[in-house]
Swiss-Prot record:
Oligomeric and partner information: Part of the 50S ribosomal subunit.
InterPro entries in UniProt: KOW, Rib_uL2_dom2, Ribosomal_uL24, Ribosomal_uL24_CS, Ribosomal_uL24_KOW, Translation_prot_SH3-like_sf
Function: One of two assembly initiator proteins, it binds directly to the 5'-end of the 23S rRNA, where it nucleates assembly of the 50S subunit.
GO biological process: translation
HAMAP family referenced in this protein's UniProt entry, alphabetically: Ribosomal_uL24_B
MF GO annotations: rRNA binding; structural constituent of ribosome
Gene Ontology CC: ribonucleoprotein complex; ribosome
Protein name in the entry: Large ribosomal subunit protein uL24
Keyword set, alphabetical order: Ribonucleoprotein, Ribosomal protein, RNA-binding, rRNA-binding
Similarity comment text for this entry: Belongs to the universal ribosomal protein uL24 family.
Gene name linked to the record: rplX
Superkingdom to which the source organism belongs: Bacteria
Length: 103
């Protein structure tokens, strides 16, 4: 089971966006990276195609999972993740507050 999943609210721990929060758009476990909305924005020079115009577009670039931490559901600060079995299901738990992350 992954600690960071699509739809999670995360906090950036290091890099140019340190301290900023965003939502995970996509997780790439093989590369140990994730796309986070509004984080690690890069400019891409787009060539003209039949459907798109030429120009410079901004888009999110992947960020390594080690630079992300789940935002605690209670106070929004970065927390580590633990696992617990409740009602026969494995759920994620915030180590900081003990709050469940999976509904």
């Amino acid at each position: 089971m992954q600690k960071i999943r699509k739809g999670d609210s995360v906090v950036v721990l290091s890099g140019k966006d340190k301290g900023r929060k965003g939502e995970v758009l996509k997780v790439m476990p093989k590369d140990e990276q994730a796309l986070v909305s509004g984080i690690n924005i890069v400019k891409r020079h787009q060539r003209q195609t039949q459907t798109q115009e030429a120009g410079i577009i901004s888009k999110e670039a992947p960020i390594h999972l080690s630079n992300l931490a789940i935002a605690d559901p209670k106070d929004g600060k970065p927390t580590r993740i633990g696992f617990r079995v409740e009602d026969g299901k494995k759920v994620r738990v915030a180590k900081r507050s003990g709050a469940l992350i999976d509904g």
